[in-house]
């Protein structure tokens, strides 16, 4: 019957809408506080060390050209009881390298971390090499980790008598889990009376919204925005000594971030990135291409055979100017980013021409955004 058929269609439509509701993107997406801010003080620490890579197949440093490699090799052998004073060292299987890595936050003794190894001398390739024991120091001069292991190289180099080929960077490699943490950085998180959230992108509105979300969750005013990049959180009494549990809950809170209207321009590559809040006032845009062509066709004048004249070269220059038909487009007040792009694309404008047009619109005071040129 018609009534039964219509009611069935309605039920199916309602069920489809309910099923698709979770997939619908809101007009203003929210993000976790975990993705918007870091816990102040919880960060990685950079480490650096100097070492030697051995086992290279003749692609290491030239010892006569790189004195520090030779000195390091001599010092290492002497520490191991090998006396080479006065001896001539000839090898191409050793290279001096710098070793870098990032010590993770809260890393404990025995934790492994990745390191990057980079050649310092004239080594052609580190392929097949092994890094010897290398202490890794922090900015305070203390040793926090020790690195050693076989290198993984992303490139290669090969050469013959008259030709050579190189792919990638064969003088740079990595050692996965190649360093062991030997010293911990003291950071008593659970004993802190307050914690600060450092926003990755400072903004007054976002900082206020984060503080409001935390206060609503805890039911008390414990969070306060200090500046656009910092929200200070006083630890409630029930979470004293258990700050980790509090931060675990706070990190999952959803907040709608606010961003300033900004246009990023990279003139070298022609890349333009515009935020969603960019607005333009009413403005007319005209764009035309002007082409100037110059051609030289010198004319040679020869004298009579029996005269004493000289050959003369007379310059002849032809200059031509062509201009494409200009187009005029009207960009209305308060248009969105998509409407702005569509309007400018209607003029047949490329990315590099668009850069100049956006800067001109900004100079005219018709664009409500900051333009940052990289």
Swiss-Prot record:
One of its GO terms (cellular component) is outer membrane-bounded periplasmic space. Its main location: periplasm. Residues 1-29 form the signal peptide. GO terms for biological process: bacterial-type flagellum-dependent cell motility. Keywords: Bacterial flagellum, Periplasm, Signal. Belongs to the FlgI family. The basal body constitutes a major portion of the flagellar organelle and consists of four rings (L,P,S, and M) mounted on a central rod. It holds the Pfam family FlgI. This is Flagellar P-ring protein. Assembles around the rod to form the L-ring and probably protects the motor/basal body from shearing forces during rotation. InterPro entries: Flag_FlgI (IPR001782).
